[in-house]
Regions:
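Conserved ATP-binding TGD loop and adjacent catalytic N/P-domain core of P-type ATPases
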Residues: 397, 423, 429-573, 581
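N-terminal membrane topogenic signal
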Residues: 1-14, 235
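Bilayer-spanning, highly hydrophobic alpha-helical transmembrane segments
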Residues: 14-16, 227-258, 270-291, 572-601
Length: 623
């Protein structure tokens, strides 16, 4: 509990003890009134003050006004204990609500704890000066000690360490980083001293963008929240006028038309009971709190949601479209097979790696990585790169060619046809065919499991879009269990394909696009819900996406959908429960069957139950 909550708790205890003690005292008349006013003012002075300020500001019809009128009316009718009890239990409900919001905020603030307090700038004499991260310019060298947060995005110039990214990704496994590696702000340096050259200003760094996104999430309200806001705007004045009519019309009818005693006191008490029952706190508080808790729970799982409207849309997702490279595959080319004739595997890889040693092409890098030994460029001469075909060179005086079938055709070398899916590098040594090396993009470890999990979530169709060859795309789709694949697409074709799918789906069905944030901004924006995966350090993805998954695990997609559906389920549970109980109690109150104690349950009891139910949205670990 914070200080404010502790003060309210003490007031509740004091007022409750005084109310019980006074109920046992044999006092009556003015003395009883004066004595009961003590616990009433102890517990309710702030509500009365808020109600008075609301009247002065012409914002009359709110829960404070309802509570003030109902309790003052009960006291004026001589029901002192009921008047104090209504205010007492209302404050208990408010305390529960405050605690629930605080718990949700703590989840968000744990994420907010990634905000760095300072940056260490190294002076010319070698000493360190602590400055505000906003003051650090691009290209500055900052020093990050063990245990400190990385304040600004940059590249490591000196040092090696393990980085704790759990606050950003929800994953506890540390990430190794050394010289030349990019580091993002918000990570915690676990071991060595790092010197980092900044590549961004603090305002443009990853941590700043994430914090800005989370802080603004509450401004984007869902359809349910907007409905409740409009509902409360008209509902509260309506029940106030209804209570007034209940207090005046039945007694007048009894007096003027039926010739009976009006029984003003009984009907006024019914009207006050009606007011207490009608207080919309359970709805007005629990619905936004459910979404707030859902966003907080999601952030702890490494899923950042930009607003409750996106959480609501995600829960209705029936079509999921994936970009292939970097989303379902790792986007890293690796040698997946070596098929040789007379030459052994290691010698073939050595020739290929040396022939490609001067190239920075991803395929060249994968060949050098597969060979795995130091390369001596001095062994290589007469290097000639043939654009779109491959490379020829002399390795230790031996003519080596590495490339596609077109290169082999140019050289007059008959090559073996390869039916495996991937990029084929044919090898010719000394004018003779020596074999081929197969290079492919590796599928992510949990990709197949992720597709199965989506189908289990009720997703009707999964679609993959890629610029790869038809055969390669088809094999990946079949291996993963993806329903539909569109290949050989240019970036603009992906937008057109998503628009076509949007036209085909049902009106209430939503389409989500999942990309890695690289060149995906137009498609992320066009889909009903844009999900950027592994978006750490990708400004475009954080900007364009509605939901950001902070690591590369495709299983997080189905988890995000389950979180959204749990949150929406809780929202509807609270709506049906609160409205159902209130309608029943309002009817019973108007008929004089439900007394003030029943009204207390219909207001405070329902609010406490709804708030406790809303807190469940925080618990996402088992989803």
């Amino acid at each position: 509990m914070n200080k404010k909550q502790k003060k309210v708790f003490i007031r509740i205890i004091v007022a409750a003890v005084l109310m019980v003690a006074l109920s046992l005292l044999p006092v009556d008349g003015w003395l009883k009134f004066v004595l009961f006013m003590i616990p009433y003012l102890v517990i309710g002075h702030d509500i009365l003050l808020k109600a008075w300020k609301g009247i002065l500001n012409r914002q009359v019809f709110d829960e404070n006004f309802l509570m003030a009128v109902a309790t003052i009316g009960a006291i004026l009718l001589g029901d002192y204990k009921e008047g104090v009890a209504v205010m007492l239990f209302y404050q208990i409900g408010e305390l529960f609500q405050s605690y629930a919001v605080g718990k949700s905020r703590r989840n968000i603030s744990e994420l907010m704890d990634i905000r760095p307090d300072y940056a260490n700038i190294e002076k010319e004499d070698g000493t360190l000066e602590q400055v505000d991260p906003d003051e650090v310019e691009i290209g500055s060298v900052i020093v990050v000690q063990p245990g400190e947060k990385v304040p600004i995005d940059g590249v490591i110039e000196e040092g090696r360490t393990s980085l704790n990214t759990s606050a950003l990704t929800g994953e506890s496994l540390p990430r190794e980083a050394g010289v030349g590696d990019e580091v993002i702000s918000g990570c915690i340096n676990m071991s060595g001293v790092l010197k980092i050259r900044t590549t961004k200003e603090f305002g443009e760094s990853t941590v700043s963008k994430i914090l800005d996104m989370v802080e603004n999430a509450s401004s984007k309200k869902s359809k349910s929240e907007n409905f409740i806001s409009k509902f409360a705007k008209y509902y509260t004045p309506a029940v106030c006028y209804g209570a007034l009519a209940l207090a005046i019309l039945p007694p007048l009818v009894r007096l003027l038309f039926l010739g009976m005693t009006p029984e003003w006191g009984d009907w006024v008490m019914r009207a006050l009971t009606f007011l207490v029952i009608s207080c919309p706190c359970a709805l007005v508080i629990s619905i936004p709190l459910s979404f707030f808790a859902g966003i907080g729970g999601a952030s702890n799982a490494g899923v950042l949601v930009k607003g409750s409207n996106y959480l609501e849309t995600l829960s209705e997702t029936k079509y999921v479209v994936f970009d292939k490279t970097g989303t379902m595959t790792q986007g890293v080319f690796e040698v997946s097979g070596v098929h040789h004739s007379s030459m052994d595997t290691e010698k073939l890889l050595e020739y290929a790696a040396l022939a490609e040693c001067h190239s920075s092409h991803p395929i060249s890098k994968s060949l050098k990585k597969a060979y795995g030994k130091p390369l001596d460029p001095g062994r290589v001469t007469d290097v000639e790169e043939i654009s779109g075909n491959g490379v020829t060179a002399k390795v230790d005086g031996v003519r080596v060619a590495a490339g596609n079938s077109k290169l082999m055709e140019k050289l007059g070398v008959d090559c073996m046809e390869c039916h495996s899916v991937g990029t084929v590098v044919h090898m010719a040594v000394d004018g003779k065919y020596a074999g081929h090396i197969l290079i492919s993009d590796q599928i992510k470890p949990h990709a197949k499991e992720a597709i199965a999990a989506l189908k289990k979530c009720g997703v009707k169709k999964t679609i993959m879009l890629t610029g790869d060859r038809r055969e390669a795309a088809r094999q990946v789709a079949e291996e993963l269990g993806i329903d539909e694949v569109h290949s050989e697409l240019l970036p603009g074709d992906k937008v057109a394909q998503v628009e076509k799918l949007l036209d085909e789906k049902g009106e209430k069905e939503k389409l989500a696009f999942v990309g890695d944030g690289i060149n995906d901004a137009p498609v992320l924006s066009r889909a009903d819900i844009g999900i950027a995966m592994g978006a750490l350090g990708s400004d475009a993805a954080i900007e364009a996406a509605d939901i950001v998954l902070m690591d590369d695990d495709p299983l997080k997609i189905s988890k995000a959908i389950r979180i959204s559906r749990k949150c929406l389920r809780i929202v509807y549970e609270n709506i049906y429960f609160a409205i159902g109980v209130k309608v029943i109690c309002l009817i019973l109150g108007a008929l004089g069957i439900a007394n003030m104690w029943a009204a207390i349950f219909a207001d405070v009891g329902v609010m406490i139950i709804a708030v406790l139910n809303a807190i469940r949205a925080l618990n996402v670990k088992k989803l």
